[in-house]
């Protein structure tokens, strides 16, 4: 299952619908703290986290760091409209705006790289 976190409801819904149509199971959250709580309840439920960099509560990079304390090596994609260089290993950056197919390619590449 993919956990997608973004505070833009329209984008979150679009990504959920698009990835679901391609056969991915998707859970969404609009806030980093809510996403962390969901992840803490069942860290093995999620195969990947996809998060915006700028979120309410705390940023996407911190969210990934906290998730990885529970599940080291969790595959992750961070998205942002601003240039960004991930500090953590194994985090893929996807610049907004992006085409849905670009996200699918990033998801497939990231999942393949983690296996």
Give a label for each model feature.
Residues 3, 28-48:
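Acidic, metal-coordinating helix/loop segments flanking the phosphotransfer/catalytic sites
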Residues 7-9:
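Two-component His->Asp phosphorelay active-site signatures
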Residues 12, 56:
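The feature encodes the CheY-like receiver
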Residues 13-21:
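Charged docking surfaces used in two-component/phosphorelay signaling
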Residues 16, 98-111:
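C-terminal output helix
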Residues 52:
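Active-site residues of response regulator receiver
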